[in-house]
C-alpha cells in the first residue's frame, strides 16, 4: 500500500460557532459535522487528515510551523484572518507547503472589507461560496494534485 498522504485542515476564528452563527451565510452544519464528513472522505482516499480550529492567530501559526516536513498539503479557512493576517501569510510562505484557501460564503459578494485576502495570491487555489461542500472540493483537489506530483 502506498504511503498515506498527510493533509492539515486549519479553521480560523468563529468557525467553532458554525451551525448557529448566521446560518443564512454559513449554513446549518456545525464544524464538527463538517470535519467528521471530511475525515470519512479522507479515510476513503487513504489520507491522514489532521484538524485544528483556533480563534487565536498564534495557534494557527504554530501549527503551520509544525507542519514543515511532515504535511503534504494544507487546507485553510482563515475566516476573519483572511483580511488581516500578514503573519499567517508569512508562516505559509515560510513552510513552502501548497495550500488551498476555503471560504463557506462567496467573499466577493460580501462587504468590501471581506473582499481582500492576504492569502489568495500565494494559494494554489481558492474555493468560496459553496458552503461546506467547499471543504470536500478542496480535499479532492489536494489529493489529485499530490497524486499527479508523485
UniProtKB/Swiss-Prot annotation:
Pathway assignment: Metabolic intermediate biosynthesis; chorismate biosynthesis; chorismate from D-erythrose 4-phosphate and phosphoenolpyruvate: step 3/7
Asked if the keyword Lyase belongs to this entry, the reply reads yes
Q: Which Gene3D superfamilies match?
A: Dehydroquinase, class II
Positions bound to substrate: 77, 83, 90, 104-105, 114
Q: Which residues of this protein are catalytic?
A: 26, 103
Marked site positions, Transition state stabilizer: 21
Pfam family name, one:
DHquinase_II
Show the CDD domains listed in the entry: DHQase_II
**UniProt name for this protein:** 3-dehydroquinate dehydratase
Q: Which organism is it from?
A: Citrobacter koseri (strain ATCC BAA-895 / CDC 4225-83 / SGSC4696)
Amino acid at each position: 500500500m502506498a504511503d498515506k498522504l498527510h493533509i492539515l485542515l486549519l479553521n480560523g476564528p468563529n468557525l467553532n460557532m458554525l451551525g448557529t452563527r448566521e446560518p443564512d451565510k454559513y449554513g446549518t452544519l456545525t464544524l464538527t459535522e463538517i470535519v467528521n464528513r471530511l475525515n470519512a472522505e479522507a479515510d476513503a482516499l487513504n489520507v491522514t487528515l489532521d484538524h485544528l480550529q483556533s480563534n487565536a492567530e498564534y495557534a494557527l501559526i504554530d501549527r503551520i510551523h509544525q507542519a514543515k516536513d511532515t504535511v503534504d498539503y494544507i487546507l485553510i479557512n482563515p475566516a476573519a484572518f483572511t483580511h488581516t493576517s500578514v503573519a499567517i501569510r508569512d508562516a505559509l510562505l515560510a513552510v513552502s507547503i501548497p495550500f488551498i484557501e476555503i471560504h463557506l460564503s462567496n467573499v466577493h459578494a460580501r462587504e468590501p472589507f471581506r473582499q481582500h485576502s492576504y492569502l489568495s495570491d500565494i494559494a494554489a487555489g481558492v474555493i468560496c461560496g459553496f458552503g461546506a461542500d467547499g471543504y470536500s472540493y478542496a480535499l479532492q483537489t489536494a489529493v489529485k494534485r499530490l497524486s499527479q506530483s508523485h
